Structures are given as C-alpha cells and as structure tokens.
C-alpha cells in the first residue's frame, strides 16, 4: 500500500471528489479524518483553524491534507448576478479556509519534522472566465496559495500541489447540452477518474519530486475552447 504510514485530513467528503479521494487514501492504507460541512462549516470564522487543531488531536499527527470542500453553487452566474453572500461564502470555504488549514498544518508538519503533502482540488475555471466569477476567483486564488505554500514549505521537505479536474457533474453542475462533444475522450468525468491521480501525487513512490504543480485531469476538454452557456440569473 502506498500510504500505509500516513494520516490525512480531507475536506469536502460529503460526496463527489472529496469522498472519492478520502476513500482512495484509505484503500492505500492511510488513516483518514473526513470532514464535511456537518463536521465543520468552513464558511464560519475560526472554523478552519479549529478543524486543523481537531485533526491533529484526533490523528496524533497529520501528514496529508487534501482540500476538496466547496459550497453549492448555481451552474452559471454572471459577474453582475452573484450576491455578496454567495461571493463571501465561496471565497471563505474554497480560498480562506484552505489557506488557513494548510498554514496550521504546515506549521505542525515543520515542528514535528513530518515530510508532509498537501493537495488542493482546483479547477479549469482558475485559468479562464466561465460565468462563475466567485468560483473562478476562488480557484485562481487556490492555485497561487498552493504555489506560495510550496515555496515556503519545500525546504522542510513538505510538498504542495493541486489537481484540476475537468467536467465532473455534481452539486451545482449538471453539464451543459453538447458538453460531451467538447471533451476529447467523449465523456464527462466521475470522481473515480480523479482520485487515483490524487493518490499518485500524494504518494512518495510516484510524486516525491513534485511540488508547486497543478495536474490537469480533464479528458481533453482544455483542447477545445469550451464555453458554458450564459444564463442570466
């Protein structure tokens, strides 16, 4: 097993990609603390640091952190349609909480001399506007946070990377008509398509010399100039 000596905190495990990654880590021998909104509402002030501290207490030490949490969203929203509450919730969960948990666990790993690994689940939306301004901004921010953490923690032997899935139907995203025609492999992804790559990145066997990188797992959708339908809301 690739991760039999590891302990991991994974957010966003109520379903989808977060759940798939948590299950895959467990299959590879890791002891995993799963965190979903019912366990820690990361939209609330102070919740992120409390979750990190709880994970350290529960697991004894944390060697892996995966941030897959993201609040529900409408499928498309223009920049003029997003409400302040939606904007704040998206950035708080995706960006602020991800950074604060990683910061707390990075300090923990450094203090305990743990050669830890962190993984942010970002998105192709981080690189181009798709009528989801709050989501895209949060994912672009995650990418830069990942790179800053990779620079800061690399000398400590701690690796920080990101994985950017393509079209994965789930909460807030059902897939636009004709979307499959714009995917080279001819189908949308499932969480099970993403989890094995996450395991590889987090493992020392396959990812030992990798940090500060974003791995795209999109079935080839980025080969097309795919555009979500504009939907005024």
Model-derived features: where do they sit?
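Catalytic loop of short-chain dehydrogenase/reductase
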Residues: 71-72, 110, 117-141, 146-155
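Active-site loop of short-chain dehydrogenase/reductase
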Residues: 6, 61-62, 109-123, 155-158, ...
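Substrate-binding pocket helix/loop in short-chain dehydrogenase/reductase
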Residues: 75-79, 83-88, 179
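C-terminal substrate-recognition "lid" of short-chain dehydrogenase/reductases
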Residues: 2, 191-217, 222-223
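A short, exposed helix-loop element centered on a Lys and neighboring polar residues
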Residues: 102-103, 147
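Conserved Rossmann-fold SDR core element
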Residues: 25, 61, 143-146, 153-168, ...
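Conserved glycine-rich cofactor-binding loop
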Residues: 14
């Amino acid at each position: 097993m690739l991760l039999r000596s590891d302990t991991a905190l994974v957010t966003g495990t109520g379903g989808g990609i977060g759940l798939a990654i948590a299950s895959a880590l467990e299959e590879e021998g890791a002891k995993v603390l799963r965190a979903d909104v019912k366990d820690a509402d990361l939209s609330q002030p102070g919740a992120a640091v409390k979750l990190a501290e709880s994970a350290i207490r529960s697991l004894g030490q944390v060697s892996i952190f995966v941030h897959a949490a993201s609040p529900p969203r409408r499928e498309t929203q223009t920049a003029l349609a997003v409400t302040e509450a939606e904007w704040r919730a998206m950035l708080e969960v995706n960006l602020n909480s991800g950074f604060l948990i990683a910061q707390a666990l990075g300090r923990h790993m450094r203090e305990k001399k743990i050669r830890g690994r962190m993984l942010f689940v970002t998105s192709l939306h981080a690189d181009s506007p798709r009528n989801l301004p709050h989501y895209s901004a949060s994912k672009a921010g995650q990418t830069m946070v990942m790179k800053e953490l990779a620079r800061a923690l690399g000398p400590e032997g701690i690796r920080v990377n990101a994985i950017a899935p393509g079209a994965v139907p789930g909460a807030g995203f059902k897939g636009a008509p004709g979307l499959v025609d714009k995917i080279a492999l001819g189908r949308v992804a499932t969480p099970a398509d993403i989890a094995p790559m996450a395991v590889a990145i987090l493992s020392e066997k396959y990812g030992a010399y990798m940090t500060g990188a974003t791995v795209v797992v999109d079935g080839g959708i980025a080969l097309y100039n795919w555009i979500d339908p504009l939907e005024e809301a």
